[in-house]
Structure formats: structure tokens, C-alpha cells
Amino acid sequence: MFAKKTTLIIPTRNRPYFLLKLLKNLKNFKIKFKEIIIIDSSNKEIKIKINNIIKNFNCKIYHSKPSTSLQRNIGLKNKDKRSKYVMFLDDDIIFKKNSFLNLNNKIVFHEKNKSKILGYGFNQNKKTKKNLLENIKKSKISKVFGLYSKKDGIVMSSGWQTKILNIRDDTLTEWIPTGAVVFPSKVLNIKFDENFGKYSYLEDLDFSLNLRKKNYMNKFLIVANAVFFHPNDIERINFNFGLIEILNRFLIVRKYKLNIFYFFYMSFIKCLMTLFMSLRNIKNITKFFGNIIGILLCLKKLIFY
């Protein structure tokens, strides 16, 4: 099993219940790692609870300022250098039975055949709803201009990426979510970009693009029957998130020299969708203003920097 040769890195913040549930989930499936590293950025009173939880599990713990990117970097810095693999997990993941075995079989197969795979992702299963943005993404104009794609895990020139959810067959992708992923240690010659802020929105997209840039291998593999669930997937509808979802994507577009015009087109559509959503939930209006300010700040950076 690959896990015995793997350093597991879990960033967490103020969620002792979910962390405990995850660790119990792994223990129940008898998944044993070479080492487990917890990087905790919780408030003082919650840190005590986290420390009490990990006493019952064989974990190392480090403390950090709140930032998913920073926390993962601390994990990378302190991992056992002999680990053949590194696995990143969000603290609220729940795995389906045999998911690790199924992923292990794919790793063994592709390494035996010397496939050029950068990383192996578990398959998130989630109920989804169609919305205005999804319909626009699939429109003819979006397809004609290459703004979006019906394929899973594609990074478009607009800076938007297609989702990776409910995959039916093993799928090669251009980016990979870092919520439940395994990388061979030999390809991890980069760090997570800490400029993505406290929440680190889109850090996984940036990390994927950077990995592809620095390595000769340029694809990731999502394993269809290696299933996990993300029960605490919260919809974020505040001003700050509306702001960073525009600014962080702009950072990626500039960093990897993607299409600025297509980025602004999709940002404008995203803004309209947020406004439309506020008709059903007035709380979305703060996110809408965040989108607007984000677009204006991007224009300012484009003109003056």
C-alpha cells in the first residue's frame, strides 16, 4: 500500500470535530501512513482540543498563522525526506470503503508502465445543481472562444478551470484539487504560493500549473473508484470571498500569461450571476460588491502596473 511510504499533510483551523472524524475514518479502514503531519492555525482555545485529539493518533503537530498555502508549505518543509509520496488532505474529508486500495492499484499500474503522471486524485462525489454560470459556460459563445470546456479538469485561457466532480471513468486532467491528492515526492520541487491569502482560494489551480511548468510530466489522474465526500462544503457568499475569487484568478492569469480579455469576460459573467443569485438570497449582494471591487482593482493593476 502506497500509504506506508507516504507523508500525510493535513492543514486545519478551528474544526476539531471534522479532524477527529477524518482521523477515525482513516483508522477504521486501517490506513497506516509513514507519518501524519497536522498543521494547526486554530484559535487558542481550539488548539487545546486539537492537541487532545491527536494524542490518540500517531501524529506530529505544528502551529501556524491561518493560510492553507503556508500550512501545506510547513508540512512539506518538515516531512520525512525518505517518503516516496506526499498526500494532502482537507480536514473534513470522508472516504468510501476501498478508495485507498483502488488508488493504490492505479499508482502501481502507472508506475510499472512508467506513465508520466504528476499526481493522483481521489474522486469527489457530490450532488450538484445547475445554475446560470454553468449554463453560460456551456453556451456556444464560450465554446467558440475557448472560454470553457465540457471536459473535466481543463484549464481555459480565461483562467477558469472546469470542475472535477462525480467522475465516471479515470480521467487525465490539467489541474488537480488538493483536498485529497497524492504526489510522488520527486515531482514536488516547488512550494505553494502564499500570496493567495488566508483562505488560499485557487491555490490548488496555481500549484497544478506550476507543477506542470517545472516538470516534464504534464497530466494528473483522477481515479474514478477512489471516492471521497466533502460534507462541510460551505457556500461562501460574503464580500471578502467575492473580492478574492476575482483577484486570485487575476493573479493566475497574469502569472501564467493567460488571456486577459477572456478573463474579464468571464469575471463579468460571474458578477452578473452573483447579482442574479442575490435575488434569491439577499446575502449574495455583498459577494456581488466584492466581485465588482475585484474587477475594478484588476483593471487598476492592468493599467498602472
Show where each model-derived region lies:
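A short, conserved alpha-helix in the catalytic core of glycosyltransferases
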Residues: 174-182, 187-190, 195-225
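A recurrent flexible, glycine/aromatic-enriched loop bordering the glycosyltransferase active site
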Residues: 150-156, 161-183
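A conserved acidic beta->alpha catalytic loop
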Residues: 25, 38-50, 93
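Non-catalytic, C-terminal membrane-associated alpha-helical segments of glycosyltransferases
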Residues: 240-250, 254, 259-305
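Short beta-strand-to-loop acidic/aromatic patch adjacent to the donor-nucleotide binding site
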Residues: 83-94
